[in-house]
Amino acid sequence: MPTTEADTTPASATLALAFDLLRRHSVTPNDAGCQALMIERLERLGFQVERLRIGEVDNFWATRGETGPLLVFAGHTDVVPTGPESDWQYPPFTPRIDADGMLCGRGAADMKGSLAAMVTAVETFIEAHPDHHGRLGFLITADEEGPAVHGTRAVVEHLREKGVAPDYCIVGEPSSSERLGDTLKNGRRGSLGGTLRVKGVQGHVAYPHLARNPVHEAAPALAALAEAQWDAGNAFFPATSFQISNLQAGTGASNVIPGQLEAVFNFRFSTEVTAEALKARTTEILDRFALDYTIDWTLNGEPFLTTEGALIDATVASVEDVLGYRPQLSTGGGTSDGRFIATLGAQVIELGPVNATIHKVDERIRAADLETLSRLYATIMQRLFT
């Protein structure tokens, strides 16, 4: 790993905060002090902060203002593991700007850069509009890259119990594809996971009449599931996808018929179908084959979609004003914490940096994009609240 110094001097308030966040070894579910940095800045602006330690996870909920629509900035301070640090061009928790103007470090894109831009955008907006209309909020967790049980999901339930209902939410996930702001995520597919266990009778391969092979019995059923059309999608979502991700059977010996097959699968589903309908149809297909089976289901998130409204209008117009081009609306990609916040009735979008290097060795984004992203967030607030 080279130790030659690149530019380690932040050129703006947004980059300075990003550097401070990137230095923290906040591998999920550890926050490593990132939230304290954000809270200190927000409290100076008059935010009321509620620290929420849920299980072993740090979260916080912060609000400013008493009346009017509530805009929430949402994100996560945790990052994925780096893998061998020797594979990185620079140490992953020593942020720097390289000779190409790229901000390098684990979390630069996903999503400490966005967090820094959110904080400085709010600082800029409040300085210019101290008596602004509406309310501002932050929902920040350190449990997004891991199980995502004690993070945003749990905080949302806490807010639901308190009767808090955000009107708008901007999630800072890296939504952009090739250049900043070219893509806005205005929805995400739902995710439904299942573990299918098909029971057979173990035996010797030379005596199949004394055994029952669950692989042979399950194969036609799995093929039927893979070939099924679950829906046709719609203008915003592709057709629902069924994928088998893991298949396990046998003892490892070549002369033993297995006694059980286990198949792990996942649906990524659109708003054209419900999780309950997918479960029912899966059961109906499997029952055709007279299998001895069980299924354990895990609903990771319902689909959500923001098709129109003040948030979409303000965001699209802000991208056009600041960047000079119109963003594309997309529901592609994996799940995000927006799926939990949408259940509170909020209009939800995702707007963040280019995602080309997320979860990769040498994660990086254009350093100049962070100051532009901060301007975008501030412009959205101006359009909504002035």
From Swiss-Prot:
Required cofactor names: Zn(2+); Co(2+)
Coiled coil regions in record: none
Keyword Metal-binding listed: yes
Residues at which Zn(2+) 2 binds: 110, 145, 359
Superkingdom of the organism of origin: Bacteria
GO function term, MF aspect, one: zinc ion binding
EC code(s) of this entry: 3.5.1.18
EC class (word): hydrolase
Gene3D superfamilies named among the record's database cross-references: Zn peptidases
Subunit structure: Homodimer.
Protein name in the entry: Succinyl-diaminopimelate desuccinylase
Lineage: Bacteria, Pseudomonadati, Pseudomonadota, Gammaproteobacteria, Oceanospirillales
